[in-house]
Every structure is written in structure tokens, then in C-alpha cells.
Amino acid sequence: GKRVVAFYTKEDIDLWNDCCARALAAAGAGPEDVCQVAYGYGLFTGGFGLNGGSQKLGCLTLPMSSGNTDRQLQFMEDLGSTVLCCTPSYAAYLAESIHERGLRDKIHLKAGIFGAEAWSEQMRQDIQKSLGIKAYDIYGLTELSGPGVAYECSAQTGMHINEDHFIAEIIDPDTGEVLPEGTQGELVFTSITKQAFPLLRYRTRDICILRREACPCGRTHIKMCKPMGRSDDMLIVKGVNVFPSQIETVLLEQGYTSNYQIVVDRVNNSDTLDVLVEMTP
């Protein structure tokens, strides 16, 4: 479909940078850190948002953008990057490249902030082990500002939503009825500080759960779980709701899978689901 165009006032950008700075601070980043931002820049919100948050926090900020792995690793080694911001799939690729080139002892990363795509808990564990870091999730969408709507803290038990900027609710995706906290449903947001592009109960299509609970980090903002799928990509096979992310979790737990493809069909009036898996050598 047509690309989403979002608008920002100067104050919107400043508040957005605050939200991203909170995410970085929750991951343990501070003025003494070197933050390598390997999200795309240009019209993509990822690079621009984390770049602003990193600068606001006082980090030495490396605006790398995505791709060019040779340059990424060179800067990571030469400038001593301690925080990495990128997609989880690119983080996994960088980890593989570091291992292949024997650079593990020359890389000093301590934390990573990964988002912009779905990733499983098993993928998190793999990245943490291979890079020797703590990997934190971050959530956002262009319509609300970009990354920084919600973020993980050191407890890694859900993402704190910046409730002073966004009101989160869970609704029934079919009826629109507001559901109580702790119930699975579709996540909707109302922006309360955005000036240029305010939204009222914007439907994200993300399926998750909200929980308000005491957190070891001391933050009191409500938490959202990692999205379990989307209301528009959930698969119903023989009456059972299936999320592709759940299949990914099972496959990655095996430890010997690479790429996979889910094929859903209907044969003789019966639903079928086949998972084609590429095995690692």
C-alpha cells in the first residue's frame, strides 16, 4: 500500500528524542558510552529517533545507518562502540560476521537495542550469547512518532510504555470493545502530547497484553508484552489460531534451522499448514 507520511513539530521531535533517550538509559547507556546507530536513516524513523535519543543522553553517537558490514565492524572496533542499535536480524548477522573474522575480543559492546521487526525470545538469547551483551526490545510505529513508544528495562519482562505521551488500551479486534488489563487483544494508542499528527485510539493491529505490575527497575509505567502477532496476519488452521512468531520460536529452539517458509493451503475442504525449513550445515 501507500507509504505512511508522518509530520512533526520541533517540540514533537524533542519529545521523541526524550522517549528514545529513556530507552537507551533503561539499557544502561550514559554519557560515557559510544552508541552505534545502525538503523536506516533517510525517511525511516529508526535511525533518526535513536540518533536523537543518543545525543540527548550525551553518548558519542555514530550515525552509521544500515548495511555496509565492513564499515560497521571497523567503527565498532576502532571507536569502541558499547551500545548497538539496529534490527535484531542485522544484529544476528553482525554477530556471525564478528565470529567469522575472529573479532570477538576486539569488540566491546555491552548492550543492544533491537526493534523494527518481530523477534523471538530464543533469538534474543542467541544474540546475547554470541555478542556477549544484553539485548533490549524497543517498540514504536511511524504513526505515533517512531521507536521509543515503549522499551525494555534491565528486568526484560516487558516493555514500559511512555504513558506521559501515549495512552495504551487493549481492544477486541472484532468488536472494538475495550478489554481489561491482562487480557490478550489488539493494542491501540492515543497520543496526548504530539502536536503535528495526533491520533485517537489508533489501531496498531498488534496482538499483545498490557500489565501494570511492580518492576524491579522502579519504573511504574504500564508494560506491554512483546507483540504475539498481528490481527491481520494471524493464521486460523482447523479452528486453531496460529501466530508465525510462535512457529519461529519452536524452530529456533532446535538450534539447526536457518530460513523457513510457512505455506497455508486448503486441500479437500481441509486447512493445511506446511513449514519448509532450511537446515544449517
Mark where each language-model region is.
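Conserved AMP-binding A3 loop
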Residues: 1-15
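Short secondary-structure capping/junction motifs at helix and strand boundaries
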Residues: 3-7, 28-34, 61-64, 136
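Short, flexible loop segments at the rims of nucleotide/cofactor-binding pockets, characterized by
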Residues: 12-13, 39, 60-64
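Short, small-residue-enriched loops and turns at beta-alpha junctions
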Residues: 14, 41-44, 92
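Conserved ATP-dependent adenylate/AMP-binding module captured primarily in the ANL superfamily
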Residues: 16-34, 68-81
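Conserved AMP-binding loop of ANL adenylate-forming enzymes
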Residues: 20-59
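Active-site glycine/GP-rich loop and adjacent strand/helix microenvironment
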Residues: 57-281
